[in-house]
Amino acid sequence: MDRRGFNRRMLLGGAAVVGTGAVATSLSVAPEAASADGPARTAPAGGEVRHIKLYAEKLADGQLGYGFEKGKATIPGPLIELNEGDTLHIEFENTLDVAASLHVHGLDYEISSDGTKLNRSDVEPGGTRTYTWRTHAPGRRKDGTWRAGSAGYWHYHDHVVGTEHGTGGIRKGLYGAVIVRRKGDILPDATHTIVFNDLLINNKPAHSGPDFEATVGDRVEFVVITHGEYYHTFHMHGHRWADNRTGLLTGPEDPSQVIDNKIVGPADSFGFQVIAGEGVGAGAWMYHCHVQSHSDMGMVGLFLVKKTDGTIPGYEPHEHGGQQTGAERRTGTGQRPEHAH
């Protein structure tokens, strides 16, 4: 069967996580995307009710992570993709020796799925709890005002480990990305999650990336999340995006500002898509925090854009290693899709 025929699936991301040997995964309901040299594929309508299992685990290096399977937790946790109108039931199991939880930004949920100690929606060591997230399309309220939809680049994280508000859990890696797509949104060839967490990226050691690969012409999506105590600026060399919900311009009259640098603070999240190497070609394109002292201290990674023959002009691997680390979704890689349950 053509892989494009799968509309409900869980895709393996193929990204190694430092110190764990685990594989980052992605839960996706989107059809396979096409590259920029062909017609763009788009997100379908939502309305599905889905069920997944998620674990909180301690990693071999002492950090913490979320995973779809025991023993396969990652930092960042699995990328979760939904379409407006979907409902997701998450059976959350806490394998840690301290209480943990799951809290999401941007989606709809009842107080029992808030994931905090203040309303007793956390999970004790060894316990389980079902968190339910709902999404909705935009529409007009009965009073005539407009209600925004759920579509956007969001994120989830622990809210109780270490302190009453979860500072320790976030610091050690209990976080991940959520994408809610609107019907008709353009789909990428690959999605990568980048988390500025204090002075680290995806909790990797300073000056070690993560680095992400693409081939010239690929449509690549980045989800950028900020945690910790600091404000940063996210900058990517050689590529630009629109400062709006999707990161894409809708046409020549779209008033959205086109940028290559964005100020971000704790709990901020945004996303965008670029065509790898568009107008600039292949290369080792740097992304980093543009607070100069932060980049000097190691908040730097590479967007490795290859020619079609696989080469990268002027690039020789150096200390910025760790290619394709963190949660990601890739399409067209020949990996076997798994049905979501």
What positions do the PLM features span?
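An exposed, glycine/acidic-rich loop-and-rim segment of catalytic or binding clefts
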Residues: 167-202
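Intrinsically disordered, low-complexity Ser/Thr- and acidic-rich flexible linkers and loops
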Residues: 141-147, 330, 336-341
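N-terminal, post-signal-peptide metal-ligating segments of extracellular/periplasmic oxidoreductases
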Residues: 2-130, 188-192, 196-220, 299-317, ...
